[in-house]
C-alpha cells in the first residue's frame, strides 16, 4: 500500500509499504477514508520528536471503514464507519481508569504516527479498537468527524477545560491556527464575556472573528498588543490565556497578559525550553497548566456536533487526494501563504 513516512529530520517520503495485519486479538484494521495533517506532523519531520523512528507512517487524525477485527473486538465489525481517536486506550490500566488515556500503559497514548504507524496511508492497524474507535452518526460530515480525532478535543481539554473557562470571564487565545480555533469554538460552550484572538496573520484573525471571537489583536508589535489586551480588560489582564503555538515567545506573551489568579493553559507543542517567570507569577496567584490530550471528551463532543452546537468543518480550507499528499504538506507547511487552516486528504487509492 501507499503511505507517507518519516525518513529523517527534514525528509518524509510517499512510498510503498506492507499492508498492516492483525497482531493482537484487540486490534482492528481500518481502511482510511479521510485524514489530515497536524502541526505535530511538521514537528516530527523537523526532527523535534526523536522518539519517532525512520520509516514510521505519519498522521494521527482520520476516519475510515473497518476491514477486519481481531477475535477480542466486540464493539465493531467489518463495514462499520469509524472515527479514529488520535489516542489509543486499553481502558484497563492505572491511567486509563483515571481517564488519562494519553498515558495508557499498554500500547496506548499518542502512538499513531509517532511510535507506531499512523493514518496517512491506505490502511491502519488500530490497537485496542473497542476503546480507540467511535461509531459515527450518519448526519455528521466526514470533515467534522476528522476534526474530532485530535484538534477539537485538544483545544477543548487542554485549553478550555484546563484553563477553567467560565461564564463572564475573559479569554485570550494566542495563535489562530487549528488548535487555537478549536479552543475558540469550544470556549463558547461556557459563554465567556471576551474571546480575544491573538495572531500575526490578519487573515486568520478575520477567520477567528467569523468563528465567534469578540476581539482580535495583531501581535506583530508585542508591547502594543499587550497594552491593547490590558485596555480590553480594565487594566487587569485576562482570566485565561491559552497558548496554541508552541514557541517561547508566545508562552512569554501569555505570562505578560495573564491577570491575578488567572490560568495560562499551554496547548502548543514546544520543542525548546521557555523562560518561566515564577518570581513574578507566584505572588499574583497565577496557575499554569500543560497537557497531552486524552480524548476522554470525545463522546461529549460528538453529542455537541450532533446538536450543531459547533461546526468544526469550517476549519477545512483545502482538499487533496492521498496521491497528492506531498502537495498537501507543501500547502500546510506554508499555511499563511495559502490561507490554509486544515486540509482534508481523501484516500483515492484504495476506494471501496
Over which residues does each language-model region extend?
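Short Gly/Pro-enriched turn/cap motifs at secondary-structure boundaries
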Residues: 7, 19-20, 53-59, 111-117, ...
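Glycine-rich beta-strand-centered segment in the early N-terminal region that forms part
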Residues: 20-35, 48-97, 137-140
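NAD(P)H dinucleotide-binding glycine-rich loop of Rossmann-like/cofactor-binding domains
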Residues: 92-174
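Mid-domain Rossmann-like dinucleotide-binding core that forms the NAD(H)/NADP(H) cofactor-binding site
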Residues: 138-221, 227
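Glycine-rich cofactor phosphate-binding loops and adjacent beta1-alpha1 units
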Residues: 162-166, 206, 211-287, 351-352
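Conserved acidic E/D residue at the C-terminus of a beta-strand in Rossmann-like folds
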Residues: 199, 268, 292
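C-terminal hydrophobic helical "lid"/dimerization subdomain
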Residues: 252-256, 295-352
Amino acid at each position: 500500500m501507499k503511505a507517507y513516512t518519516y525518513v529523517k529530520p527534514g525528509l518524509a517520503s510517499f512510498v510503498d509499504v506492507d499492508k498492516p495485519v492483525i497482531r493482537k486479538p484487540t486490534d482492528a484494521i481500518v481502511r482510511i477514508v479521510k485524514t489530515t495533517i497536524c502541526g505535530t506532523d511538521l514537528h516530527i519531520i523537523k526532527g523535534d520528536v526523536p522518539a519517532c523512528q525512520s520509516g514510521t507512517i505519519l498522521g494521527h487524525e482520520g476516519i475510515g471503514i473497518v476491514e477486519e477485527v481481531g477475535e477480542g473486538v466486540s464493539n465493531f465489525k467489518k463495514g462499520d464507519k469509524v472515527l479514529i481517536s488520535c489516542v489509543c486506550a486499553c481502558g484497563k490500566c492505572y491511567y486509563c481508569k483515571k481517564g488519562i488515556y494519553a498515558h495508557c500503559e499498554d500500547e496506548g497514548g499518542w502512538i499513531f504516527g509517532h511510535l507506531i504507524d499512523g493514518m496517512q496511508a491506505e490502511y491502519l492497524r488500530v490497537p485496542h479498537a473497542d476503546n480507540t474507535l467511535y461509531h459515527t452518526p450518519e448526519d455528521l460530515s466526514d470533515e467534522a468527524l476528522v476534526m474530532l480525532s485530535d484538534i477539537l478535543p485538544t483545544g477543548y481539554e487542554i485549553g478550555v477545560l484546563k484553563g477553567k473557562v467560565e461564564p463572564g470571564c475573559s479569554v485570550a487565545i494566542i495563535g489562530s491556527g487549528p488548535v487555537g480555533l478549536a479552543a475558540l469554538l469550544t470556549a463558547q460552550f461556557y459563554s465567556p464575556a471576551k474571546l480575544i484572538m491573538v495572531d500575526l496573520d490578519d487573515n486568520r484573525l478575520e477567520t477567528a472573528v467569523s468563528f465567534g471571537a469578540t476581539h482580535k489583536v495583531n501581535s506583530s508589535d508585542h508591547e502594543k498588543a499587550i497594552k491593547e489586551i490590558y485596555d480590553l480588560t480594565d487594566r487587569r489582564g485576562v482570566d485565561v490565556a491559552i497558548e496554541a503555538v508552541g514557541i517561547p515567545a508566545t508562552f512569554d506573551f501569555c505570562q505578560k497578559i495573564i491577570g491575578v489568579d488567572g490560568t495560562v493553559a499551554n496547548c502548543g507543542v514546544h520543542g525548546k525550553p521557555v523562560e518561566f517567570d515564577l518570581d513574578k507569577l507566584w505572588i499574583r496567584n497565577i496557575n499554569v497548566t500543560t497537557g497531552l490530550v486524552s480524548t476522554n471528551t470525545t463522546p461529549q463532543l460528538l453529542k455537541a456536533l450532533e446538536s450543531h452546537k459547533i461546526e468544526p468543518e469550517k476549519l477545512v480550507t483545502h482538499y487533496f487526494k492521498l496521491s497528492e499528499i506531498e502537495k498537501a504538506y507543501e500547502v500546510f507547511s506554508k499555511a499563511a501563504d495559502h490561507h490554509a487552516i486544515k486540509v482534508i486528504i481523501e484516500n483515492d487509492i484504495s476506494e471501496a
